């Protein structure tokens, strides 16, 4: 009799090969008892045994980590991918990476594809709109969220201390004499990080009695320039301070300011999130809330490894590892853009 394979077991049990794989991995998720019983009966009747080189039982691993990133065009994402790769390699693991392009449908497809590929765990930098799918995935295998949370998911999250960093940037602009502040953000509000920073910004303005608003820069073209010009003209005669909510928005801000040119008010101060080489050059050096991307990546892989260890060594213990929100401290790099 020919060697039985997973697809043969699946055909006889009337299920997909992925379902058989989850059964063999002790990751049943929402699999019914009836489905489990059918698979078990076929395995017992055929005497199926996975080949040693290919089996994915609890006692062994694929050493593959699935990574889903929302926007590779964001410099934060490319820096994070490098850090995740290094941290995973140090533990003998490789990455399988998917880019959703801020498309919830692509993100959902990536979740399913990576799970079916047999990764040991998932790192998800969600674009939003897939909370239920991500929570369901976390019921099937270890998941750690990168930078962006989901609602009521009870899933580990590793992020920066965003509220403290916002306060630090407001401090820098206030000390530089700014009388009105604008937080520049993107059109979409799907990012929990951008929402958290906007909320923290509003709280800081209220606490300090400062005037300001959140301004949307839709893109680096005419729309973004026009909106910024409106904000600047609305604060005529006031010393204005601008904060870019992330590195991508900062690049859009830089383009918009270049187009506005001579109409810029005297004493304009600028600060941003995300520290990249151009921050040291543009505007004579830009005061920056620098996230520790390497430390964030290390903590993500470390936490995911802890969950994988539990799943692969102790039956039923995964749920006992309580979810954590891990905030990795960033720092404020003070530069000439906020000097008096």
Where are these regions (language model features)?
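Hydrophobic alpha-helical segments within soluble ligand-binding/sensing domains
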Residues: 156-183, 222-230, 291-312
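Short, solvent-exposed amphipathic alpha-helices that sit
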Residues: 38, 76-90, 165-169, 192-211, ...
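Flexible loop/hinge segments that line or gate small-molecule binding clefts
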Residues: 124-168, 188, 248, 274-286
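Short beta-strand elements in bilobed, periplasmic/extracellular small-molecule ligand-binding domains
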Residues: 88-99, 180-184, 198, 202-223
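Amphipathic helical "hinge" segments at domain boundaries
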Residues: 33-37, 46-113, 117-120, 199
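N-terminal helix-turn-helix DNA-binding module of bacterial transcription factors
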Residues: 1-62
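An alpha-beta-alpha
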Residues: 169-208, 316-337
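Flexible loop/turn connectors
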Residues: 233-340
């Amino acid at each position: 009799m020919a060697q039985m394979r997973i697809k043969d077991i699946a055909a006889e049990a009337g299920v997909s090969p992925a379902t058989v794989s989850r059964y063999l991995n002790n990751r049943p998720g929402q699999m019914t008892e009836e489905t489990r019983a059918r698979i078990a009966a076929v395995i017992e009747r055929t005497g199926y045994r996975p080949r040693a080189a290919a089996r994915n039982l609890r006692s062994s691993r694929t050493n593959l980590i699935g990574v889903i990133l929302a926007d590779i065009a964001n410099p934060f994402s490319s820096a994070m991918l490098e850090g995740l790769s290094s941290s995973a390699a140090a533990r003998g693991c490789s990455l399988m990476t998917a880019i959703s392009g801020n498309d919830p449908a692509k993100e959902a497809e990536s979740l399913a594809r990576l799970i079916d590929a047999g990764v040991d765990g998932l790192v998800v930098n969600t674009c939003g709109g897939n909370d239920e799918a991500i929570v369901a995935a976390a019921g099937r295998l270890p998941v750690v969220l990168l930078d962006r949370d989901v609602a009521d998911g009870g899933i580990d999250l590793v992020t920066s201390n965003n509220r403290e960093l916002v306060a630090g940037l407001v401090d820098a602009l206030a000390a530089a004499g700014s009388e009105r502040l604008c937080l520049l953000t993107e059109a979409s509000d799907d990012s929990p990080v951008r929402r958290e920073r906007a909320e923290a910004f509003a709280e800081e303005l209220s606490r300090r009695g400062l005037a300001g608003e959140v301004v949307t820069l839709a893109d680096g073209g005419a729309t973004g320039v026009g909106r910024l010009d409106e904000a600047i003209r609305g604060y005529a005669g006031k010393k204005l301070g601008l904060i870019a909510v992330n590195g991508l928005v900062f690049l859009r801000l830089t383009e918009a300011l270049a187009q506005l040119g001579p109409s810029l008010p005297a004493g304009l101060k600028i600060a941003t999130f995300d520290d990249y080489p151009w921050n040291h050059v543009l505007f004579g050096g830009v005061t920056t809330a620098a996230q520790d991307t390497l430390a964030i990546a290390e903590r993500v892989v470390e936490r995911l490894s802890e969950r994988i260890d539990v799943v692969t060594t102790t039956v039923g213990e995964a749920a006992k590892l309580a979810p954590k929100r891990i905030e990795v401290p960033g720092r404020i790099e003070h530069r000439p853009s906020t000097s008096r």
